[in-house]
Regions:
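Amphipathic alpha-helical surface "interface" segments used
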Residues: 269-272, 445, 501-502
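Conserved alpha/beta enzyme-core scaffold
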Residues: 1-440
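Intrinsic disorder at enzyme termini
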Residues: 434-449, 462
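Generic detection of intrinsically disordered/low-complexity segments and helix-coil linkers/edges
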Residues: 337, 414, 442, 484-487, ...
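Long, contiguous binding/interaction regions
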Residues: 447-631
């Protein structure tokens, strides 16, 4: 036991002295990444770099002491980064540093097998060695462990502030050629202040994530905010890239148990950790949390084994066909690929898995739409259209998997910012993505009235989701009408309609939710919903009375669905200040007449040529029915 520690002590000398001995021109140096960057060693390296030429520095993500401005070191060293962050973004886009677009799952092979990637020196930070001589890579296992295993010379900063994380995070001290004990605080990432846009997106996403899901979240404010709205879930698992304070919040809520995970049962799995000291203390020597290198965490074959694997990642731009740009703004690199593609591909093939793209509808200044007809010139496609499942903005969720280009375009325009919807629709028409007569979604606010979404269980224990209709329901509504018996169609339209073409149905789904309101009862998940019933009113602005109609699918009748929908639409109409309801009902349609009579208001009616005109006012509670014209 003491032999290990003695061996380490023998190699402890001044960091400057060590670096002077091992540095020479033209070397390739790997530096530990993220909040695990060995800042003390980096500061010493920066003091010596002006004495050398053409040194190549490789790092994943800089959160520590590496400079933002590489101009003074232009002749001495050049940074190659595998992921672009705030500290390297300007240098990369000014041509003073290089960005390497790469799947993180392929990095171990690159480091170990490609002779052009052989590291001469690796500078890393570790926890103090245990009694057996093992040090933990702490909060930066990722590719640091892989670099240590392949570098010719390894120089480790031993920092007692570094958590001793468990999993496959350990390196024996004998692997280090030099060590330096230096304690200093680790960089901390403050959880950003609340964002109304991020919160709205998170609320939309929360229902998509089922109990027992295993979650991966990418870097960014919105993926982090999703965690806040998952507190009520049960038995969630975590298999992710970067563990943050948002994850800690979710863990402390009791929603995370990992008991449904296929792999690493009951364990939280990550490869990096970036957050507060509270988070670092949580992962320290915690058997609930396991850190693994990139070859494990990003392994698609392993990820896809998880039941209900959900990958939640942000985007900078998405075109109307579903191509996602997540690393650049045109030719300007903003971030990187990281594990984006690895997790998206794996989750899309996981049993019950889902891929969710989150993005604000506009740029931060509101001047540009992030949903576009075509990606900005120079933008890199990180996720192809074939792997995208759900897309969420603050205006709703679009489901793209298995959809045509036309259906994708309509779904994405429907969740774009209203200021850009007309423009997007016109551009979609010009490239023949949609019908030439396609109606654009509403362009004013308030938009989709999500407050009227609810759930209801009908006998014999059949849950249905009740919500206002959307433009993306066009095909589902067509299918619903075509399955109705002839008699029901006649009752609904008071005519023998045999066809429900696009030009007619699109007018039924593109509504303003004020003068026209349609509520549907659906079964199935977003994007695969089937309509069980529909109720609609159309407001007569002269009388302030709303004409109502209702239809229920043949397989869903006699369960109270029609009655519920009429009651619900009546509640909405009353809430909007409408005076009352009116309906035109065939005398033979006794069911609809009965529904009207159980709404709790006085029902008035008159019969002409076999059709009842039935009406009620919300200011007249149920009393004796009268047959007279409404005023």
């Amino acid at each position: 036991m003491n032999g290990y520690k003695d061996k380490v002590r023998q190699r402890k000398v001044s960091e400057l002295e060590i670096l002077r001995q091992i540095l020479r021109d033209g070397l390739r140096i790997y530096i530990g990444s993220g909040c695990g960057e060995p800042q003390h060693l980096v500061r010493a390296l920066l003091r010596l770099l002006p004495r050398h030429r053409d040194i190549e520095i490789v790092q994943n993500l800089s959160m520590g002491s590496l400079p933002q401005d590489w101009k003074p070191l232009e002749e001495n060293a050049r940074l190659k980064t595998l992921f672009v962050g705030p500290k390297s973004r300007d240098a990369v886009n000014d041509g003073l540093a290089d960005y390497i677009p790469i799947y993180f799952s392929s990095i171990p092979r690159l480091f170990q097998e490609d002779p052009l990637w052989k590291f001469d020196i690796a500078l890393v930070q570790v926890s103090p060695p245990d009694e057996h001589g093992f040090c933990s890579m702490g909060i930066s296992v990722g590719m640091d462990k892989c670099a240590v295993e392949s570098a010719s010379v390894v120089f480790a900063q031993i920092n007692r502030e570094m958590p001793r994380t468990l999993g496959d995070s350990f390196i024996h001290s004998s692997r280090f050629h030099y060590t330096m004990e230096h304690d200093e605080p680790l960089p901390e990432i403050v959880f950003r202040e609340r964002s109304a846009v991020a919160e709205r997106i998170a609320r939309y996403i929360s229902p998509l994530i089922e109990d027992g899901s295993t979650i991966q979240t990418g870097v960014g404010r919105i993926p982090n905010w999703v965690m806040i709205y998952l507190e009520g879930k049960k038995d969630l698992g975590i298999h992710t890239e970067v563990l943050t304070d948002a994850h800690l919040h979710l863990i402390n809520s009791g929603a995370v148990t990992g008991l449904k995970k296929t792999l690493n049962h009951g364990k939280i799995v990550a490869t990096y950790c970036m957050g507060s000291r509270k988070l670092y203390d949580f992962v320290d020597n915690n058997p609930e949390v396991e850190f693994y290198p990139v070859e494990y965490v990003y392994n698609r074959k392993l990820i896809r084994q998880h039941y209900r694997m959900v990958a939640i990642n942000s985007a900078l731009e998405i075109d109307l066909s579903g191509q996602v740009c997540a690393e650049s703004m045109g030719h300007k690199v903003y971030s990187g690929i990281g594990g984006y593609v690895d997790f998206m591909h794996a989750a899309s093939s996981s049993p019950g898995g889902k891929t969710i793209i989150v993005l604000p509808s506009t740029t931060s200044d509101g001047r540009k739409s992030r949903i576009v007809s075509h990606l900005t010139d120079g933008a890199g496609v990180v996720s192809p259209r074939s792997t995208v499942g759900y897309v969420a903005t603050e205006f709703g969720v679009a489901y793209l998997h298995g959809k045509t280009i036309r259906e994708r375009a309509l779904a994405l325009i429907n969740i774009a910012h209203p200021r850009f919807r007309d423009q997007l629709m016109n551009e979609a028409k010009s490239i023949h993505y949609v019908y030439e007569d396609q109606i654009a979604p509403p362009i004013y606010e308030p938009l989709y009235p999500g407050q009227w979404e609810t759930s209801q269980v009908f006998p014999p224990n059949m849950p249905l989701f009740i919500r206002p209709i959307k433009p993306t329901d066009e095909r589902a509504l067509q299918e619903f009408f075509y399955t109705l018996p002839f008699e029901d169609i006649y009752f609904r339209f008071l005519s023998a309609m045999k066809a429900f073409p696009h030009r007619n149905v699109q007018a039924m789904v593109n509504i303003d939710y004020e003068h026209v309101m349609s509520v549907i009862a659906v079964t199935g998940e977003i994007g695969a919903e089937k309509i069980a019933g529909i109720a609609r009113y159309i407001l007569d602005q002269k009388t302030n009375m709303a004409e109502i109609d209702v239809a229920v699918g043949s397989g869903w009748q006699h369960k109270g669905i029609g009655t519920f929908l009429v009651h619900y639409v009546a509640e909405i109409a009353k809430d909007k200040g409408i005076t009352g309801l009116v309906a035109y009902v065939l005398a033979a349609n006794r069911a609809m007449l009965a529904v009207f009579h159980c709404l709790g208001y006085a029902v008035h009616s008159k019969l002409e040529e076999g059709i009842y005109e039935v009406w009620l006012r919300f200011d007249e509670p149920a009393m004796a029915c009268r047959t007279e014209e409404y005023k």
